[in-house]
Amino acid sequence: MSTTEFDGIYLNQSKAHGRLRMVETGLGWKAVQKTSMGGSKETKKDEPFLLGKEELLAAFWSRGSRGFEMKIQTKNRGAANFDGFEQDNLEELKNVMKRNYGISVEQREHSVKGWNWGKTDFERSELVFSVANKPAFEIPYAEVANSNLVGKNEVALEFQQPADGRAGDELVEMRFYVPGVTSVEGDENPKKKQKTEKEGEEGKEGDDDADADDESEEEVQSTAQIFYDTLKEKADIGAVAGTAVVSLSEIYLVIPRGRYDIDMYANFMRLRGKTYDYMVQYKHVQRLIVLPKPDDLHNILVVQLDPPLRQGQTRYPFLVMQFLREAEIKVELNVDDAEFAEKYADKGLKQSYDESAHQVVGSIFRGLTGRKLTVPGSFKTVHGHAGVSCSLKASEGHLYPLERNFLFLSKPVFIPFAEIQDITLSRVGSSVTTSRTFDMTLKLRNAQGEYQFSNISKEEQEGLEAFIKSKGIRLKNDLAEEKALLAATLAEVDDDSDDGGEFRGSADEDDESPDEDFHAESDSEVAEEFDSNAESSSGEEDDE
């Protein structure tokens, strides 16, 4: 059996190069790493990549990122890219592929024009974007985590994130602008198909009228919608092997807002909304928190995610579900008795539920994710609620002091006690004695900033102080200091008023008395000053 080997080959843009070995029964690739002596050795961490002869469909040769690459299309395992060949290896590869597997290696040229408009082709295992009939790039269906129709002419693709969680630059989303509309004809139109079946049962009467009706009932869809539907079908978005463990219908989410059907599988769940769909791996769930809203009508289930869900530039590190407190739901797990006993009985799950909605959903989430369900602790407001009404910047909501964390809703902000350096109670811009509210500032460690919660009722001050002190968090009470300073200032003013009263002028000293230097003038003098006819008047009197 002849063997052909190539060194320095990279599989699917891997960081580690390896050795490609080709024999008559198939081919295999194994990663290698450099040793301290400058040689190389096979790694134990990475398993070899093997392809049997029966899996190979086609092969293509083109330029790659590390020289030249050979892409192999398979029947069931997508496309495999082997990068790092020299140009001189082409003839040898052609001979080996033809002799061992009966496959011809086709040469392809990639488009390097840099245009961002072109045509898309849905091939067997990848989406190909072509410019001037040359492929510009390919997107393997396996790399598409989710897709959403944004508006009428835009389709967004979200890509799988690295499993190792490494930091660095990563392409997370791509959007395609797909203009125009398309008429759906023939069997593609479900309305026409149903009508045709009905006419077949009733006979062939009125065929001419039926044909006219069919032409008028052609459905017009946007090209973006057809692109989106085709991508979902090809990439199997939303389609998984097996049946959901449990399905929850019409669950109302405050964040992201809308009603979603939640299908929960063994290792992940899917949220299917009217516009957007999301997939959440259970390993990304960090916390589960169940809280009663102070309105005495609703309960909330908060699911903290890391990494967060993405929708364009918007991130959702929290899922917030809201339930009516009196609402009840009835669900059953889609597993038989044997499977339940083997996989789910030890996780605290039950085969059927008929309880309050928030209790059922919380219990199912706890069992499948393996996360502890956090509930309110010992803190209560003066009205017996678990949350204090306040504001964070422009957002109004409630601050929930939990046993190890603070949680602010409606826009979630999660603050562990371990990250808090100190807490300051203060009131800015108002008199301490007349103010009915105060502010609470949480300063974080390592200069991570601070959170200022304002407009907290003064009735809650005593309870919050006692809670903060019980958790061993450093507390600064500027309200007490300001009140003490104000009292001292008022005391000084009272002392000054008692000692200095005799030195102040009295209003009694300003009694009215005639001015001795003032002599009242006669009426004639007044007339001479203000009356222009004063002289003539006096003259007339003399004549008389």
Curated annotation (Swiss-Prot):
Domain of life: Eukaryota
InterPro entries: PH-like_dom_sf (IPR011993), RTT106/SPT16-like_middle_dom (IPR013719), RTT106/SSRP1_HistChap/FACT (IPR050454), SSRP1-like_PH1 (IPR048993), SSRP1/POB3 (IPR000969), SSRP1/POB3_N (IPR035417), SSRP1_DD (IPR024954), SSRP1_sf (IPR038167)
A cellular-component GO term for this protein: chromosome, telomeric region
Biased composition regions of type Acidic residues, renumbered to the chain: 204-219, 523-544
Any Pfam family: SSrecog
Keywords (A to Z) from UniProt: Chromosome, DNA damage, DNA repair, DNA replication, Nucleus, Transcription, Transcription regulation
Note: In contrast to the orthologous protein in animals and plants, this protein does not contain a HMG box DNA-binding domain. This function may instead be provided by the HMG box of the associated NHP6 protein in the FACT complex of fungi.
Protein known as: FACT complex subunit POB3
Organism of provenance: Yarrowia lipolytica (strain CLIB 122 / E 150) (Yeast)
